Amino acid sequence: MQPHLFTPLTIGSVTLRNRIGMSPMCQYSAVDGFPTDWHLMHLGARAAGGVGLIILEATAVSPEGRISPFDLGIWSDDHIAALSRIVKLIESLGAVAGIQLAHAGRKASVGRPWEGGKPIAPANGGWPVVGPTAEPFAPGYPTPIPLDAAGIARVVADFATATKRARAAGFRWIEIHAAHGYLLHNFLSPLGNDRNDEYGGDLRGRVRLLSEVTAAVRAEWPSDLPLAVRLSCSDWTPEGLTIADTVEVARMLREQGVDLIDCSSGGIAPGITIPVGEGYQVPFAAQVRREANIATAAVGLITRPEHADAIVRNGDADLVLLGRELLRDPHWPLRAARALGHDLAPPPQYLRAW
């Protein structure tokens, strides 16, 4: 019997060749938002390795929305041609090309991780950061400028325009980044948002910005193309977002035309203990799928083919996203297929190795 991990997944008009996706992972190798040869090598290698979906790293909808000065961007029409080259490469190798649209909010303007990852002051090439309030992410981080009504409207418009550019570049899958303490999660979590206007307060108020962004993106994105949202399903503290909150948010997003929830967690504040272990976020994907009646992706320390196959077979998630495991092994899907007794053809140039 064919392993469940290697069955196709169809959402709208898009069919993935299997249930394995590459999670968006920043490479900190862009120049002025433009991809470089590193991105072509990095993304092309994983497409050749057999994944069904590749989601480009957090791609900023505005210059100030970048995590670092070295992040991909989609804030200018000038970015379209370079991104289109990546799309064509990925799709020529049998994978579907997706993109994660993002705004880093108060966690923006930091250096590369391997260079310390510290905040960069505007005088040194950084930029002012924004958030729901003036509360910085952590000691030593800059004080955000609280977004007013005009600032919020700009963010929503930036996501909408970025969506148009993503379509022009040929992407067939969009993911809105609303996790890991970045702008949309910062608004969504009670740990990051104590506003007393219509964008704060209870969950309905805190979800408003994400809802407005989702509506703007869905309006510009063809109805037959998949739209996903990455959520931090838990802040891992009772004072923060809970899985019950996330189920409610997922129901709202489903009503807005979102097709899939990418179930991650954490990132809203430092110093919170996360019980990391194999598949530690899979229960979130299972609960959201079951209680919100929406497709989900499982992500986080999924490394064994048998485990990944069981996630799909058991109905815990519709899609398995791999991150660091694909950094370690670009050909993980080919190896997983062999381990599960499935014949997944490598590129013909590599046949002699398989």
Curated annotation (Swiss-Prot):
It comes from the Bacteria. Transmembrane segments: none annotated. FMN binds at residues 23-24, 26, 58, 100, 230, 301, 323-324. One of its GO terms (molecular function) is NADPH dehydrogenase activity. It catalyses: A + NADPH + H(+) = AH2 + NADP(+). Its EC number is 1.6.99.1. Homodimer. Behaves as an active monomer in solution while in the crystal packing assembles following the classical dimeric architecture of other thermophilic-like ene-reductases. Belongs to the NADH:flavin oxidoreductase/NADH oxidase family. NamA subfamily. Is a robust biocatalyst showing high thermostability, good solvent tolerance and a wide range of pH optimum. This is NADPH dehydrogenase. It comes from Chloroflexus aggregans (strain MD-66 / DSM 9485). The lineage of its organism: Bacteria, Bacillati, Chloroflexota, Chloroflexia, Chloroflexales.
